[in-house]
């Protein structure tokens, strides 16, 4: 293995600390070519698809990519942002806004911490962002995947990629990991405020007449639960804590799982059939919120807000409400700061005064020291 050269060391340079927010990823454009490139990277990850490579790769390249790329590109086109202040993939736009807002809040709190964001698949890549942090002299990095509920298919593969990048560095930084925050009070509070704020503006469901709040999480193959992946249990706990915070009874809200892929059994109940059944039995209003997605993306804006609404109404339902994800809501940015600071304890979060830095450089140079 070849190890990359390190940036030149500067005497007296203070150790810098960074928070790296990591999300799943997105294509660079809503085109079949860009979507195909993204899907290839995503679905080639053995953490995501646990099928022997010799069996899976011919299926991926021969069947899935040629047909799914074009269909998925049309879906991305339907939700692509083209506003003056927000252009591009919603997932990337909102993740970047989260990083920027968290950076400002940390500065306001007196913490000199760099906040960056990266994608596990696509751009900006984990490797490119970590290399940029290295050039800035970063010596402590907190990896904070934006997956509230841990799964080997999401959080673990983000960690894998960061470890792979570091395996080529000569001078490695200190590293800390946020495994999950599915039951963190700041996260639950942000979810509570997001739903409560929506209801304050658009009215609250009439639970007495049978209206329902659906909490839709991304699904996983059922066999992963049997193999020990904790994701399902953590989703249920998040749902229970949010329901309690909202003061709801068990029958007034329901946890479901979306985005099933393939024919194998996934975590149930499935979101789409649940919405269709609610419409069929005459439910007048359904609100859908996706607590496992801190930023709106194709799974929320297209699969739920568009397809889910259609499922419900075609089956006879009337009033469908999609509650936006946390995105860059003030309560969520404050929650992110709370989560990050809990894991940053003991690391330097303040840069010394310039006079002190100059004094350090002078002392180091006078002694001929290398640090």
UniProtKB/Swiss-Prot annotation:
Record keyword Cytoplasm present: yes
Task: Name the Pfam families on file.
Answer: Ferrochelatase
Q: What is this protein called?
A: Ferrochelatase
Q: Where does Fe cation bind?
A: 218, 299
Q: Which NCBIfam families match?
A: hemH
Function of the molecule? Catalyzes the ferrous insertion into protoporphyrin IX.
Q: Where in the cell is it found?
A: Cytoplasm
Molecular function terms in GO for this entry? Answer: ferrochelatase activity; metal ion binding
What family does the Swiss-Prot or TrEMBL record give for this protein? Belongs to the ferrochelatase family.
Q: Pathway of this protein?
A: Porphyrin-containing compound metabolism; protoheme biosynthesis; protoheme from protoporphyrin-IX: step 1/1
Taxonomy, top ranks, is: Bacteria, Pseudomonadati, Pseudomonadota, Betaproteobacteria, Burkholderiales
Write down any Gene Ontology CC term: cytoplasm
Q: What is its EC number?
A: 4.98.1.1
